């Protein structure tokens, strides 16, 4: 990436910090597809995971490092040799595009109660961590965890030392979302004034949203001179989430008068597609009134507003929806459309799929074509994401029959395949879906408590595909999010619940 004084590096941590949100875990295949879309979006750095934390994270980072080209691929590590070595190994395939991101808490409360170490020990550990990471990669980022609650003098000291040790990016996180904009901007300015070699590195910020100020704090820091911003798509993340990258990007794009002509490599037309993909893959719905990408972001209900929009869009819209991807779909496909037409449309939508995956999607496409007249892009996206989200099926649905009559007790009969064994059971319930879920529990021996159940229409019309998302708690230990789609909502509900069971058994 070509760096100028006004070039902002966009660092995406959706696959690492964003995935820490309860119920938002993604499979390696889902993470890879999100990473490919992030590359199309034009982010500069993808933080793909925390390799030492689990074998799954290690493999996911390795796969993304091998297959995703364009952005830098980053792995997180504590300032511990085992962490740094795991990150280096996972990032091998990225070669010169690899970045190791080491972090260490610096605030007084963390030094005293979490780490039980004094300032000198903290500096020593940070310097050793950066030096070790530098043996493996040229691009090393250091984060001073809880920087916004760290004494400015000590923060400046440790930043100076890690720069001398070889850090190329220094990150100033508002880890618990405590800062307010002017205060955070003042901290960034303080570092520019008091760290001797700070002009030799990139100054980064990473803000959390506990007080609803993550985006505001990030923008204030950029105005103060920060030239890397870290965040997630849709603002997902633990607790109240992270800074929403799409909001930061559009604020910079819409208000150059306020922030200066800050340049990024972001392809604005990919914003909406990226938002929707992350929502579907993570199972976290985007709130309807969310800025930029919410369903209501460009909806105008008041008559006066509608009249103004019709006369001149700019009366009530400060962003042209088309520039971020809010456009009408192309002509729909039908059951008579062939495999070549389907494959071509999938490429236009940005999906790169294996032959076997396209075969499976084409088979489902034909089945849906028998049930509905037109198949729209959103229908295709739902089919693709169902394919991407597939996991090893310990139990596979073979047959379902539901009996519901007015005044009677709903009953469901379920047939599942478990390897070579076919298992059948039935149950009654408060409704058809409840009865089916209880029958699945009887067969699998799992005991799922349905925490959330959401059904939405993928497209319009009576023949629309219904997409069901469930959050299920198994034995009060594991919260699992799963989804499925079908023109039959009851079938989609059962498949979604069974997907959750299979996920819990992994």
From Swiss-Prot:
One of its GO terms (molecular function) is acetyl-CoA C-acetyltransferase activity. Its main location: cytoplasm. Its cofactor is Mn(2+). InterPro entries: 2-IPM_HCS-like (IPR050073), 2-isopropylmalate_synth_dimer (IPR013709), AIPM/Hcit_synth_CS (IPR002034), Aldolase_TIM (IPR013785), LeuA/HCS_post-cat (IPR054691), LeuA_allosteric_dom_sf (IPR036230), LeuA_bact_synth (IPR005671), PYR_CT (IPR000891). Coiled coil: none annotated. It is found in: Cytoplasm. It catalyses: 3-methyl-2-oxobutanoate + acetyl-CoA + H2O = (2S)-2-isopropylmalate + CoA + H(+). It is an enzyme of class 2 (transferase). Mn(2+) binds at residues 17, 206, 208, 242. Its EC number is 2.3.3.13. The keyword Kinase does not apply. It comes from the Bacteria. Keywords: Amino-acid biosynthesis, Branched-chain amino acid biosynthesis, Cytoplasm, Leucine biosynthesis, Manganese, Metal-binding, Transferase. Residues 8-272 form the Pyruvate carboxyltransferase domain. GO terms for cellular component: cytoplasm. Residues 396-506 are annotated as: Regulatory domain. GO terms for biological process: L-leucine biosynthetic process. Pathway: Amino-acid biosynthesis; L-leucine biosynthesis; L-leucine from 3-methyl-2-oxobutanoate: step 1/4. Catalyzes the condensation of the acetyl group of acetyl-CoA with 3-methyl-2-oxobutanoate (2-ketoisovalerate) to form 3-carboxy-3-hydroxy-4-methylpentanoate (2-isopropylmalate). Homodimer. Belongs to the alpha-IPM synthase/homocitrate synthase family. LeuA type 1 subfamily. This is 2-isopropylmalate synthase.
């Amino acid at each position: 990436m070509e760096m100028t004084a006004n070039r902002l590096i966009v660092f995406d941590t959706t696959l690492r910090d964003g995935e820490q949100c309860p119920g938002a875990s993604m499979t390696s295949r889902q993470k890879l597809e999100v990473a490919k879309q992030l590359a199309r979006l034009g982010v500069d750095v993808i933080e793909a995971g925390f390799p030492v934390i689990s074998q799954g994270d290690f493999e996911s980072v390795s796969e993304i490092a091998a297959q995703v080209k364009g952005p830098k691929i980053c792995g997180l590590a504590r300032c511990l040799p085992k962490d740094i070595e795991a990150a280096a190994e996972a990032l091998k395939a990225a070669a010169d595009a690899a970045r190791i991101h080491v972090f260490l808490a610096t605030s007084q409360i963390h030094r005293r109660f979490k780490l039980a170490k004094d300032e000198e020990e903290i500096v020593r550990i940070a310097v050793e961590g950066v030096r070790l990471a530098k043996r493996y990669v040229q691009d090393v980022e250091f984060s001073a965890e809880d920087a916004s609650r760290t004494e400015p003098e000590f923060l400046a000291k440790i930043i100076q030392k890690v720069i001398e040790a070889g850090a190329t990016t220094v990150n100033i996180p508002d880890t618990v979302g405590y800062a307010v904009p002017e205060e955070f901007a003042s901290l960034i300015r303080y570092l520019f004034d008091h760290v001797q070699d700070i002009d030799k590195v990139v100054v980064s910020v990473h803000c959390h949203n506990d007080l609803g100020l993550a985006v505001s704090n990030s923008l204030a820091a950029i105005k103060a001179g920060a030239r890397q911003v870290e965040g997630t798509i849709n603002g997902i993340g633990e607790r109240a989430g992270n800074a929403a990258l799409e909001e930061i990007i559009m604020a910079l794009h819409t208000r150059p008068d306020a922030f200066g002509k800050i340049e990024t490599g972001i392809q604005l037309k990919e914003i909406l597609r990226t938002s929707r993909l992350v929502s579907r893959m993570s199972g976290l719905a985007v709130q309807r009134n969310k800025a930029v990408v919410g369903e209501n972001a460009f909806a105008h209900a008041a008559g006066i507003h509608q009249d103004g929009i019709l006369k001149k869009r700019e009366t009530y819209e400060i962003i042209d929806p088309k520039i971020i991807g809010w456009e009408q779909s192309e002509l729909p496909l039908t059951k008579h459309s062939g495999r070549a037409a389907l494959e071509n449309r999938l490429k236009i939508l940005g999906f790169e799929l294996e032959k076997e995956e396209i075969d499976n999607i084409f088979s489902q496409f034909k089945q849906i074509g028998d049930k509905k007249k037109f198949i729209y892009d959103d229908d295709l996206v739902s089919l693709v994401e169902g394919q991407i989200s597939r996991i090893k099926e310990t139990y596979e649905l073979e047959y379902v029959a539901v009996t519901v009559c007015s005044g009677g007790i709903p009953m469901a009969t379920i047939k599942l395949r478990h390897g070579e064994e076919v298992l059948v059971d039935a149950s009654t319930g408060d409704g058809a879906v409840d009865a089916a879920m209880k029958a699945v529990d009887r067969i699998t021996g799992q005991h799922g408590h349905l925490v959330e159940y959401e059904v939405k229409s993928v497209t319009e019309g009576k023949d629309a595909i219904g997409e069901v998302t469930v959050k299920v708690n198994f034995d009060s230990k594991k919260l699992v999010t799963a989804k499925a789609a079908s023109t039959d909502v009851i079938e989609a509900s059962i498949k979604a619940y069974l997907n959750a069971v299979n996920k819990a058994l992994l």
